[in-house]
Design a protein with these regions (language model features):
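C-terminal motif of bacterial Sec signal peptides marking the signal peptidase cleavage site
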Residues: 23-27
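Small/flexible residues
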Residues: 10-11, 32, 219, 316, ...
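C-terminal amphipathic alpha-helix
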Residues: 307, 312-358
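Acidic/polar, low-complexity intrinsically disordered N-terminal segments immediately downstream
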Residues: 2-14, 18, 29-188, 202
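Extended amphipathic alpha-helical interaction segments
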Residues: 162-319
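A periodicity- and composition-biased signal for non-globular, repetitive helical segments
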Residues: 11-15, 36-37, 223, 259, ...
């Protein structure tokens, strides 16, 4: 019995030893397997498939402009045409009597006296850009504000830029834009027991992809810059806008000269026929002359300012569009690069996970 017990204990002991030896040998054989020299191909494909999302170049916002305009009064044209025949016919046409009655009713006697006494020298000074004397201006402003008198005056419309009326005293405003560049971390946690060759291959795949992403970003940035340069080169020079205005307003002033001089000559020639209407009609002519020259001065100054404002706004629109496009390029690049960094980490992890035991 004792011998059998010893034999049984020996057998169990030997079996346990064999089992332990087998486990040790198995573990050692796993440890001795070579580590991979390339990352997992599926993860390589995942990295290579990362691309920058398409970036569409946004053009600058359009800057709409309208020119100043001068609309001649139909009633004034009718009256001026009728004045020429009074001296010869000895009669006053209804249109002239109607105009005199409208002015007489709308303008107080004191203002009539002030406006009828305006000299040709004063009118010439205003035509040249000078200020209207204070007393005359006060009387003129009251008269021009009356609808009955307005019917015999030209209508001036100021220019607009970007939907805003330009008066000639517009301060240009700058537009600034900033582009935020997202910081991208390339730090990868070190993974123990990974093959140096496998990591090197993983980094090579990543670096190739990053170079491709960099090239795409450079192309997108260049497209934004090219669009900006094209837009800026298409903006007319301020001088090209302002230079023609000299001739434009010289012609308008010449037309007023002709009208005023002819009207004064006709009224003077018909003074005997006109009687009490003479000073009233002369006042109307002076009102028309002062209003026309001062109005032309105002709209010309406004148009000159509008040229600068339009140029400034177009440049600002081009700059804003460029900055928007560069920002879109940077955002698309940052998104793709972040995905590439995640894929790079997965590649290096695959170098560890494919190979030896833990």
């Amino acid at each position: 019995m004792l011998k059998m017990k010893n034999t049984r204990k020996l057998s169990i002991t030997m079996m346990l030893c064999l089992l332990v030896l087998s486990l040790v040998m198995y573990n050692c054989s796993k440890k001795d397997e070579p580590l991979p020299d390339k990352p997992d191909q599926g993860k390589v494909d995942d990295l290579n498939n990362i691309e920058i999302a398409p970036v569409t170049v946004t053009p600058p916002a359009a800057v709409a402009t309208t020119e100043a305009s001068v609309e001649v009064s139909a009633k004034a044209t009718e009256v001026n045409g009728a004045l020429g025949g009074i001296a010869a016919s000895g009669t006053v046409p209804a249109s002239v009597s109607e105009a005199a009655a409208a002015v007489s009713a709308a303008v107080p006697a004191a203002d009539l006296a002030t406006l009828s006494a305006v000299t040709p020298a004063t009118i010439e000074a205003v035509k040249a850009g000078g200020a209207i004397p204070a007393e005359v201006k006060a009387a003129l402003d009251k008269a021009a504000a009356n609808p009955a008198v307005q019917a015999y005056l030209p209508k001036f419309t100021l220019p607009t830029v970007g939907g805003v009326t330009v008066t000639g005293r517009v301060a240009a405003s700058g537009v600034s834009a900033t582009t935020a560049n997202a910081g991208i971390s390339d730090a990868i946690e070190a993974i123990q027991e990974a093959s140096d060759a496998c990591i090197a291959n993983a980094d090579g795949v990543y670096n190739t992809k990053k170079a491709a992403l960099d090239a795409t970003k450079a192309t997108n940035d260049a497209a934004a810059t090219t669009a900006y340069n094209t837009a800026v080169s298409a903006i007319p020079a301020v001088g090209a806008c302002t230079d023609p205005l000299t001739a434009k307003y010289a012609a308008l002033r010449a037309a007023v000269d002709t009208q005023v001089n002819q009207a004064l000559a006709d009224v003077d020639a018909a003074q005997a026929v006109l009687g009490d209407l003479y000073p009233i009609l002369k006042t109307l002519i002076n009102i028309q002359a002062l209003n026309a020259y001062a109005g032309l001065n105002t709209v010309q100054a406004a148009e000159i300012t509008a040229c600068t404002v339009a140029s400034t706004q177009r440049l600002a629109a081009a700059t804003a569009a460029r900055d928007l496009n560069i920002a879109a390029s940077q955002a698309a690049y940052a998104t793709a690069l972040a995905a590439a960094n995640v894929a790079r980490t997965a590649l290096i992890q695959s170098c560890h996970n494919q190979g030896g035991g833990n």
